[in-house]
UniProtKB/Swiss-Prot annotation:
Bias (Low complexity): 23-34, 242-255
Protein name (Swiss-Prot/TrEMBL): Serine/threonine-protein kinase CBK1
SUPFAM superfamilies the UniProt entry points to: Protein kinase-like (PK-like)
Residues covered by the AGC-kinase C-terminal domain: 673-754
Amino acid sequence: MYNSSTNHHEGAPTSGHGYYMSQQQDQQHQQQQQYANEMNPYQQIPRPPAAGFSSNYMKEQGSHQSLQEHLQRETGNLGSGFTDVPALNYPATPPPHNNYAASNQMINTPPPSMGGLYRHNNNSQSMVQNGNGSGNAQLPQLSPGQYSIESEYNQNLNGSSSSSPFHQPQTLRSNGSYSSGLRSVKSFQRLQQEQENVQVQQQLSQAQQQNSRQQQQQLQYQQQQQQQQQQQHMQIQQQQQQQQQQQQSQSPVQSGFNNGTISNYMYFERRPDLLTKGTQDKAAAVKLKIENFYQSSVKYAIERNERRVELETELTSHNWSEERKSRQLSSLGKKESQFLRLRRTRLSLEDFHTVKVIGKGAFGEVRLVQKKDTGKIYAMKTLLKSEMYKKDQLAHVKAERDVLAGSDSPWVVSLYYSFQDAQYLYLIMEFLPGGDLMTMLIRWQLFTEDVTRFYMAECILAIETIHKLGFIHRDIKPDNILIDIRGHIKLSDFGLSTGFHKTHDSNYYKKLLQQDEATNGISKPGTYNANTTDTANKRQTMVVDSISLTMSNRQQIQTWRKSRRLMAYSTVGTPDYIAPEIFLYQGYGQECDWWSLGAIMYECLIGWPPFCSETPQETYRKIMNFEQTLQFPDDIHISYEAEDLIRRLLTHADQRLGRHGGADEIKSHPFFRGVDWNTIRQVEAPYIPKLSSITDTRFFPTDELENVPDSPAMAQAAKQREQMTKQGGSAPVKEDLPFIGYTYSRFDYLTRKNAL
């Protein structure tokens, strides 16, 4: 059994020995206190003296063999009868200043535990220290089996310390109280932890500051790198630009020699700027001619193949004999050969004989001609090249040629040839001996609604054909509606009218209006000018006054009609049939042709145009104020359908009939009820011209044209032609550049029956 008390030998001295023990324990306590202060309480705490187990007890308890061997080795160091337990991270055993164990024979029993020494106040050491050296004092005995952590925990709560050597020993204060030492150690631990936390936080803040400084330095470094790269890139670009400029300033041969890349090849440099302007024009002309030659060759080859396939299909559908089919194919082959020879033949003015002049204009004239080799009659339209340049009519001339050449419709005048010389462009077209619609209006003044319905229906079909080709006529008027030999109409003058091309330019009318207001004092629409006479005011206040068909006014209308014909041959023209949106530069479409149709219909039923005036300026004002100026006279009766159709045509572009539905929208109007649109051209016309010969021009004002002088441009061109003929010269090549490809020949001229 484990005995926690210490037995002294009987007969030992009491008083002297007690004084000696008290002095010896004071020295021991001082050394232990000094030693505890020097050591780190977190690493090692001094062990109380005289705490150990006997070797016999360890053997009886069956301790480990290694521990027994260790105890046997240590027995010689501690004297007889005592062994020492190996220290677990304890410092070395204090110096053997206490010879009490050596001088007193102790029973070989287990020594008292540390808990017994520090837990009880009646132990031998405290008794000796207090002067009570009685060896009969009994200490409480605890066996190892009776010791537990719970008992130690309860003892700690009561202020006593644990006696287990396997728990960390605590430092004793001078008064022997363990609880105060425990609190001091815990407070010291908390202080150390707080200091460590502060240090950790300081280290973290320093690390963060250092990281931020590193990031800023890295960003600055990256920015510097980017700036350096940009500067290097700019320098490289500048060097490349300088090299390109140097290369451009040098010829390829020089640059090749400089770069060392020249080989046995020979380099040619294109420098057209070193050539004269005339040479450059000739080179451009040759280029365009070659391009046009191959384009036309491919086009004619495709058309030739299509004609043969069409004929073979037609022959297959008929039950003809093989001999007859062979004759048809042979006839087609002969016509193709003639056409190829005709294409290679260069036509000129000398190939035609002029019968008479049937029309004049600002830029040319219209002649009745006869081809010398065939004797057929044609209408030749002549246009002056120099005026086309000056008046910016090159696009219009080309458009007119394309429309006439690309259309096979019976509603459009047929074009047979087109060619040119140094001064003029020539269009050889079919001759329509019935004249034009203006001639019929001058002769009969008024049309009935049935006659008007017939001609307006044919005009709708003709305009629809032009629109399907992708063109806008923009100059539909009675002068350009021709009558063929059977009395049906055809449209002509596409893009260029004889003397009316300026009416398509709003600046022209604005200029005329400003000049007229500044010089003649003509008032604006709806205003009254007191400086003019009453008679003039009656004719110039268009908004208020309307033309009434009195005898005097009818005479004025007839006079206007005669002057209207002469006006067509002048350079001034009249805007009677032009839509208002053309003047405003607001953009226009195909609906502008339907306005012209409404104006012509008004003239056929009423007897004069809806905005008739004595001057173009007045007509312009009336058209721009059509809502007030469009009036119907009371003494001329027309049907409600006719008036409704006219009003729906002479209105704003967005509300105009035909704007959205095209020609079909106009065809469905009640005024055209009963019209057979599919067979109208086979219907007998209201008027069929009667001719005495193929050169009969009674329906053309040839007598009036004799008194019309040629335009200054035409007169000057005639003089230049005479001089060029005498000198044998030619016009500059520059004037031929826009007209390359203007030449044209129609294949089916050989079989057309309407050519006279």
